[in-house]
Regions:
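Methionine residue identity
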Residues: 1-3
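Low-complexity, intrinsically disordered or signal/transmembrane-proximal segments
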Residues: 12, 16, 29-30
Length: 229
């Protein structure tokens, strides 16, 4: 079974599909848990690319609608050209954000996250999105799902320079992307390379100064929907 690639949205709103993802060798039952007959995914991820629109506000309402999926923490990262502004904290969406905070987050691309902890403790250091720097600039990642090879992935990305600030597998995926970019790959190639190291069920959104990436695991276990504004 061939995994689906990320859907890549550039700043002109053009979609592009890619090939070549590695599927997990684990049975589907191991990816979805002991009760594959019921929905067990947690966390909410949201992303929006909209020129000349208040994307922070759009992300806020998107997270508000997804809040049933996670109520421990909330966060939004907004890109304004080559700059990224991140705000995240413990609590409900309405407790973490108000109009004053949102007004300080101009831009045309935003990703957001509601957290329900499945790996890592319920602390602010584990709130998302995760933001890291690369040679191509900053990127932000929001993740729903679980990796069944998190221990192996941590060993793979622990190159002696990675400064881990959380206990989540989401940060491990982000470091895998960062290191792939810093090896000389562009964003789509780096994401493909990083996901070859990941086994599990997941949906991801990744924001960069060059575009928005939406990724779903090859089995389609974790929900992810996209559309046009």
């Amino acid at each position: 079974m061939r995994m689906r690639c990320p859907v890549v949205w550039g700043r002109q709103g053009v979609g592009q599909n890619c090939e070549g993802f590695l599927k997990s060798r684990r049975p589907v039952q191991q990816l979805v848990g002991e009760r594959p007959d019921r929905m067990e995914e947690a966390c909410g991820v949201f992303a929006v690319l909209a020129v000349e629109q208040p994307v922070a506000n759009l992300a806020y309402f998107g997270l508000y609608a997804l809040q049933h999926r996670g109520q421990e923490s909330a966060g939004i990262a907004v890109f304004n050209q080559d700059k990224v502004r991140l705000h995240k904290d413990m609590g409900l969406v309405s407790q973490v954000f108000d109009q004053e905070v949102l007004a300080r987050m101009p831009g045309d691309l935003a990703i957001g996250h509601n957290r329900y902890s499945t790996t890592g403790s319920s602390r602010v250091c584990n709130a998302q999105p995760v933001v890291l720097m690369t040679r191509l600039g900053a990127f932000a990642l929001a993740h729903n799902g679980n990796l069944v090879n998190a221990a192996e992935l941590r060993q793979a990305v622990d190159d002696g320079q990675a400064e881990f600030t959380s206990t989540t597998d989401s940060e491990l995926i982000a470091f895998a992307v960062q290191q792939a970019v810093d090896r000389g790959l562009d964003w789509p190639e780096a994401i493909r390379s990083a996901l070859k190291l990941c086994q599990g069920a997941f949906s991801l959104v990744i924001g960069t100064s060059q575009g928005l990436f939406a990724i779903r695991d090859g089995y389609g276990i974790r929900p992810l929907v996209f559309g046009h504004l």
